[in-house]
Curated annotation (Swiss-Prot):
InterPro entries cross-referenced by the UniProt entry: ALB/AFP/VDB (IPR000264), Serum_albumin-like (IPR020858), Serum_albumin_CS (IPR020857), Serum_albumin_N (IPR014760), VitD-bd (IPR000213), VitD-bind_III (IPR015247)
Record organism: Mus musculus
Glycosites: N288
GO biological process: vitamin D metabolic process
Protein name per the record: Vitamin D-binding protein
Pfam family, one: Serum_albumin
Top-level lineage group: Eukaryota
Modification Phosphoserine occurs at: S434
Subunit structure: Associates with membrane-bound immunoglobulin on the surface of B-lymphocytes and with IgG Fc receptor on the membranes of T-lymphocytes. Interacts with LRP2; the interaction is required for renal uptake of GC in complex with 25-hydroxyvitamin D3.
GO MF term set: actin binding; calcidiol binding; vitamin transmembrane transporter activity
Region forming the signal peptide: 1-16
Lineage: Eukaryota, Metazoa, Chordata, Craniata, Vertebrata
Keywords: Actin-binding, Disulfide bond, Glycoprotein, Phosphoprotein, Repeat, Secreted, Signal, Transport, Vitamin D
Length: 476
């Protein structure tokens, strides 16, 4: 698997280019020889589908064709020594044409102002934001087999593109393993005497790998969006909201452990990284929290580590504790050696008192604490804290109240009941609104809530939506 990943990274015209053209060419040619054309092509399709997840199948497929063609030509015995450099340069030039058939990216025009190796490296760094709302829907068994029998290769290509573009944040080895097993299942079952029985049996055997791949995509998407430190605080917020009766000492090690797992596994070349790390993490979850919360205790009775992890991951926030209001960290807290500890303590204490979803808290806490920390570097830090703390406290309170209003009634009701209550609230708030306008308002608000008012809401999408909804609060 590691050898496969070397190939895929080289195909992206990335790190190998910095080591020299001969090094890059030798790597790619060795991998083509080892894998053969079809596996080389399939793996290229997976890579570019996940890299350019917003592109069409035709755009990705065209790029793959170009890459495979130039690799075949330039790795052939007796090929011109300059072939690889010439063809990759031609590809980067073609990518800059207005009618280029390749994936479109807003950063392409800037790359096209550069020349030679600099342009190739710039192009290699381009990628689309991950798909935070996967749209892939598996066809029925009959539809699968009909498409497979009609065009086995076309079916495989379309599946690799759709699955990889939807779940592209899953670690690459997992993505490769799952798609390979899935296509093997289709090939076996669509040619068997009893496809239905075959599919049931095969899917049961693949269940763990399927869950591991989709769950890894979820958690790695957030990690990619937030980065390591913000991911750590995000997991701390979620755990504090799920188990507000726990202590910081119970939840902080779990947040840090999970963040370390993601930092190791999301870009790992090992297929076993997530498979071995997550079970160990679930043991720690159960050791730390099963006695602190009845829902965690129930989750820890599940029969597999993956089921335990999923149970705890999707667990909603508990009712926040009714505790005295918490004060913002002071200069003494933030300007000494225990800055991180003070911020963790404040994040934990605020989260266990607050029902607003994590995406809201993560968004408002970062600038709030950053502004306070900056007071430490001013000439008169005491005066800075005295001025900034009351202002930041008002902004923080206003932001949280607005977030609670936007997500009111969502988590404790069915979606239908929520929409009824939402309509009543909006009707009371805007009594002169026409029925058609009210309907539009309900649809807009409920769409936002369905995407951004749960504990695992996607950060990139929701951050921009919160900006749009709360612009006055954010600027005040």
């Amino acid at each position: 698997m590691k050898r496969v990943l070397v190939l895929l990274l080289a195909l992206a015209f990335g790190h190998a280019l910095e080591r020299g053209r001969d090094y890059e060419k030798d790597k790619v040619c060795n991998e083509l020889a080892m894998l053969g054309k079809e596996d080389f092509r399939s793996l290229s399709l997976i890579l570019y589908s996940r890299k350019f997840s917003s592109s069409t199948f035709e755009q990705v497929n065209q790029l793959v064709k170009e890459v495979v063609s130039l690799t075949e030509e330039c790795c052939a015995e007796g090929a011109d020594p300059t072939c690889y450099d010439t063809r990759t340069s031609e590809l980067s030039v073609k990518s800059c044409e207005s009618d280029a058939p390749f994936p479109v990216h807003p950063g392409t025009p800037e790359c096209c102002t550069k020349e030679g190796l600099e342009r190739k490296l710039c192009m290699a760094a381009l990628s689309h934001q991950p798909q935070e709302f996967p749209t892939y829907v598996e066809p029925t068994n009959d539809e699968i087999c009909e498409a497979f029998r009609r065009d086995p290769k076309g079916f495989a290509d379309q599946f690799l593109y759709e699955y990889s573009s939807n779940y592209g944040q899953a670690p690459l080895p997992l993505l490769v393993a799952y798609t390979k097993n899935y296509l093997s299942m289709v090939g076996s079952c669509c040619t068997s005497a009893n496809p239905t029985v075959c599919f049931v049996k095969e899917r049961l055997q693949m269940k763990h790998l399927s869950l591991l791949t989709t769950m890894s995509n979820r958690v790695c998407s957030q990690y990619a969006a937030y980065g390591k430190e913000k991911s750590r605080l995000s997991h701390l917020i979620k755990l504090a909201q799920k188990v507000p009766t726990a202590n910081l000492e119970n939840v902080l090690p779990l947040a840090e452990d999970f963040t370390e797992i993601l930092s190791r596994c999301c870009e790992s070349t090992s297929e076993d990284c997530m498979a071995s790390e997550l079970p160990e993490h679930t043991i720690k979850i159960c050791q730390n929290l099963s006695k602190k919360n009845s829902k965690f205790e129930e989750c820890c009775q599940e029969n597999t580590p993956m089921n335990i992890f999923m149970c705890t991951y999707f667990m909603p926030a508990a009712e926040p504790l009714q505790l005295p209001a918490i004060k913002l960290p002071t200069g003494k807290d933030l300007c000494g050696q225990s800055t991180t500890q003070a911020m963790d303590q404040y994040t934990f204490e605020l989260s266990r008192r607050t029902q607003v979803p994590e995406v809201f808290l993560s968004k408002v806490l970062e600038p709030t604490l950053k502004t306070l920390r900056e007071c430490c570097d001013t000439q008169d830090s005491v005066a800075c804290f005295s001025t900034q703390s009351p202002l930041l406290k008002r902004q923080l309170t206003s932001f949280i109240e607005k977030g609670q209003e936007m997500c009111a009634d969502y988590s404790e009701n069915t979606f239908t009941e929520y929409k009824k209550k939402l309509a009543e609230r909006l009707r009371t708030k805007t009594p002169n609104t026409s029925p058609a306008e009210l309907k539009d308002m309900v649809e807009k608000h409920s769409d936002f809530a369905s995407k951004c008012c749960s504990i695992n809401s996607p950060p990139l999408y929701c951050s921009s939506q919160i900006d749009a909804e709360m612009i006055d609060t954010l600027q005040s």
